[in-house]
């Protein structure tokens, strides 16, 4: 595995979360070293990492604009949003759960970036 993919997993992958509430976000953001300073928004993708990797090819992905890839199937995700105030710890987050498609950038068949600001169209 390459460093960019390992970084992607550290920032955005949690296979089986212990919860999806604000406490989950506060704990995970600190555990994954995203609280110095407080990162504004971060999304954790849950499930199987092979399914996420499959977005990089045609098994579970399709081309999207600007060289990105969009998943064909939805993923369970938890998005953590900083509540505002000081960017210095302690950081307080609000959790938002969703089941949605994801948009990522891939390199050599591995996810390296999650497009945080992608909002899926309403069905």
UniProtKB/Swiss-Prot annotation:
Regulation of its activity: Divalent metal ions, such as Cu2+ and Zn2+, may inhibit the ribonucleolytic activity.
Keyword GTP-binding set for record: no
Modified residues (Pyrrolidone carboxylic acid): 1
PANTHER family listed in its UniProt record: ANGIOGENIN-2, RIBONUCLEASE
GO terms (BP aspect): angiogenesis; cell differentiation; defense response to Gram-positive bacterium; negative regulation of translation
Residues reported to bind Zn(2+): 40, 82, 113
Annotated GO CC locations: cytoplasmic vesicle; extracellular region; nucleolus
Listed InterPro entries: RNaseA (IPR001427), RNaseA-like_dom_sf (IPR036816), RNaseA_AS (IPR023411), RNaseA_domain (IPR023412)
Location, primary (coarse class): cytoplasm
SMART domains per record: RNAse_Pc (SM00092)
Lineage, highest ranks first: Eukaryota, Metazoa, Chordata, Craniata, Vertebrata
Motif Nucleolar localization signal boundaries: 30-34
Glycosylation sites: 33
Name of the protein this chain belongs to: Angiogenin-2
Class of enzymatic activity (EC top level): hydrolase
Subcellular location: Cytoplasmic vesicle, Secretory vesicle lumen; Secreted; Nucleus, Nucleolus
EC numbers: 3.1.27.-
């Amino acid at each position: 595995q390459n460093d960019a993919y390992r970084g992607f997993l550290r920032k955005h992958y949690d296979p089986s979360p212990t919860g999806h509430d604000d406490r989950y976000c506060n704990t995970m953001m600190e555990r994954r070293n995203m609280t110095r300073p407080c990162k504004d928004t971060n999304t954790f993708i849950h499930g199987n990492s092979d399914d996420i990797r499959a977005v990089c090819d045609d098994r579970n992905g399709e081309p999207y604009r600007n060289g990105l890839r969009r998943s064909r199937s939805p993923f369970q995700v938890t998005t953590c949003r900083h509540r505002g105030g000081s960017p210095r710890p302690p950081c307080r987050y609000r959790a938002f759960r969703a089941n949605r498609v994801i948009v990522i950038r891939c390199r050599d068949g591995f996810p390296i970036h999650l497009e945080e600001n992608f909002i899926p169209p309403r069905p």
